[in-house]
Amino acid sequence: EVFIGNFLKENSYRDDVLISTKSPSWLMEEKGDFEYYLDKQLEKLKTDSIDIYLLHALTKDDWNKVRKLRVLDFLDDSLSSGKIKHVGFSSHTEIDTFVDILDAYPKWEVVLTQMNYLDEYYQTGVMGLDELKRLNIGSMIMEPLRGGRLVQNIPPEVQKLWDCAEVKRTPVEWALEYLWNRNDVDCVLSGMNSLEQVKQNIQIASNVKEISESDQDLIREVARTYKTLTGNECTSCGYCMPCPEGVDIINCFNEYNIGKMLNNPKGSAMQYFSLIDEDCRADSCIDCGDCEFVCPQMLDIPQELEKVDKYFGREFNHF
């Protein structure tokens, strides 16, 4: 924020751009904290208003907390004063909490949510996009390249499929054009670490190709192939839930399988330890066996949870 503020002021660019930043919801302890952080951000950005202000990374617990702190009153006041022009939120939560947040406030205008061709049914996925479309709320997409994992170290099985495409694209083009061809996606945010990546994204965005039916079939086949590389065959059906000990079995397996699939244990560990409450992680399993009897895939769920616990390991528990 300090860098952006200085750059925009020194170059007189403020009127040429829209500024978006986020409120650190997890840091809020009392109602006055919302305005405190907003005023600090306005100071850093050297502006008197923020165009798009997001309540950032809302989890179920964070949402319940900030509602009690009357965050919606804060948003109303900030909109009325002009400190904020448009409001939204970002979230990696499940669909039920996502819908609760959407329905709680009629002034949401945009939501930042995770989506890519692997994550159609992960977190809120396509169901979340359906809800945004229903409410006429703008959608901004994060993780279009899955943190770069969809374009780096491509498994041979996946590359072989891409090579069969009638219209040749790079892995970056496949991932971005998949999203840009969806009528429920308004804006795609992709992290960039170099000027070369900036130029590459500009070039792709300036020449978006249509995704044909055969292209869609190929993308689905690539997604299926990636998923054969997972650690177990959990389908996230939910028959094992709720666990009597409170273990979040589905999300424990989701993060484990994504880490195995993309060969990215560190990235999945960050998600695992930051998004799953401590009491709901794999090591809370007591091997009661209730879940095994209802699993359609006949997974030995306690044994699989033990694998999850060993996979992430104690060395990752600093996130």
Where are these regions (language model features)?
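Glycine-rich anion/phosphate-binding loops
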Residues: 28-36
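Beta/alpha (TIM)-barrel catalytic core signal, keyed to glycine-rich beta->alpha loops juxtaposed to Asp/Glu
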Residues: 58-235, 239-251, 266-275, 282, ...
